[in-house]
């Protein structure tokens, strides 16, 4: 019985190893480097914790011609078992940046080295866009709606980068070195917001391109993807034109809907700003009240100290007077 995997977690060490492999071998433009990934695939979450490089060659013109050193895989796998027995061979990686025609055949080859279905990890070593430079795939049998025979295809799995405590310290130091020290906190936040919006725009463009290909019959209908897109659309706020049953909506109705949307967003923003203003006002009043209370306590303590000091002075004066009286007698 095969285990269903939900997502993939990747250690930062693996990304650095793939990048080092690509730079060290001086891979030409258009070619890719290939290696093996190690980790744990016994749970719903696949953990990729280590990797090693492989000698790999392929023909650029003919995707069916490629070379992979089997003996090297077996010897390196045995050596890795001696170093860390918990890390198993769970799949392979290449520097992409996209899937290739020969990936399914190479993936079938790795089946004899893995306990289950091998994982394919694509690491884009020259990524310019926002987001993680990784994509994880697992080969599955796709059942067609027209009743024809099934065929092998890659199923995309969501990826995250997770590090152990020791790795987190190294990554934090690395980010501290590459971060611009002259940039302030506000500029960093604005830059991150801009990158996030660019990433969102790219994702939306990908969705539009996919839907257009489905409409033009360039891609088959995938009900799972369409269901997830519908879930996303259902999460959008309905702040515009509500008369969905009115098919003959005029341009004036659209303008009114746009104005309603702007008005709703403005009201919501003003409400949030009012909450922030009231919160700051309450904080200032509490701080002012604490200041007054502190001054009153300080004044009270000062008066008590003055009384104690005056009592000590009176006591000393009385003792001095008694001493002088005794000396006179």
Swiss-Prot record:
Domain of life: Eukaryota
Protein name per the record: 26S proteasome regulatory subunit RPN8
Record CDD domains: MPN_RPN7_8
GO biological process, one term: proteasome-mediated ubiquitin-dependent protein catabolic process
PANTHER family assigned: 26S PROTEASOME NON-ATPASE REGULATORY SUBUNIT 7, EUKARYOTIC TRANSLATION INITIATION FACTOR 3 SUBUNIT F-RELATED
Organism in which the protein naturally occurs: Candida glabrata (strain ATCC 2001 / BCRC 20586 / JCM 3761 / NBRC 0622 / NRRL Y-65 / CBS 138)
Molecular function GO terms recorded: metallopeptidase activity
Cited Pfam families: JAB, MitMem_reg
Domain MPN, chain residue ranges per copy: 8-143
Listed GO CC annotations: mitotic spindle midzone; proteasome regulatory particle, lid subcomplex; proteasome storage granule
Gene3D superfamilies: Cytidine Deaminase, domain 2
Keyword Heme: no
Region (Disordered): 303-329
Function comment: Acts as a regulatory subunit of the 26S proteasome which is involved in the ATP-dependent degradation of ubiquitinated proteins.
Family, as annotated: Belongs to the peptidase M67A family.
Keywords carried by this UniProt record: Proteasome
The UniProt record lists the keyword Magnesium: no
């Amino acid at each position: 019985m095969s285990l269903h995997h939900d997502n993939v977690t990747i250690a930062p060490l693996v990304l650095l190893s793939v990048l080092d492999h690509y730079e060290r071998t001086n891979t030409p433009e258009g070619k890719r480097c290939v290696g093996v990934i190690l980790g744990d695939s016994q749970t719903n979450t696949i953990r990729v914790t280590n990797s090693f490089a492989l000698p790999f060659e392929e023909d650029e013109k003919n995707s069916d011609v490629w070379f992979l050193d089997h003996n090297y895989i077996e010897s390196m796998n045995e050596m890795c078992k001696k170093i860390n027995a918990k890390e198993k061979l769970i799949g392979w990686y290449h520097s992409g940046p996209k899937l290739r025609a020969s990936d399914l055949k190479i993936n079938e080859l790795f089946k004899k080295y893995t306990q289950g279905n091998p994982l394919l990890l694509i690491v884009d070593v020259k990524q310019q866009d926002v987001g993680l430079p990784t994509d994880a795939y697992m080969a599955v049998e796709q059942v067609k709606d027209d009743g024809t025979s099934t065929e092998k295809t890659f199923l995309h799995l969501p990826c995250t980068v997770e590090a152990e405590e020791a790795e987190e310290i190294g990554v934090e130091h690395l980010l501290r070195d590459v971060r611009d020290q002259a940039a302030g906190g506000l500029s960093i936040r604005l830059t991150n917001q801009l990158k996030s919006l660019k990433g969102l725009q790219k994702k939306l463009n990908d969705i539009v391109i996919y839907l257009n290909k489905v409409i033009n019959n360039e891609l088959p209908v995938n009900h799972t993807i369409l269901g997830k897109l519908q879930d996303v659309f259902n999460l959008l706020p309905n702040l515009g034109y509500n008369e969905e049953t009115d098919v003959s909506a005029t341009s004036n109705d659209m303008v009114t809907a746009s104005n309603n949307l702007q008005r709703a967003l403005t009201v919501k923003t003003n409400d949030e700003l009012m909450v922030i203003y009231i919160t700051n006002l309450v904080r200032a009043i509490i701080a002012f009240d604490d200041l007054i209370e502190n001054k009153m306590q300080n004044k009270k303590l000062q008066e008590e100290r003055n009384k104690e000091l005056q009592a000590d002075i009176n006591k000393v004066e009385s003792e001095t007077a008694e001493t002088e009286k005794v000396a006179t007698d």
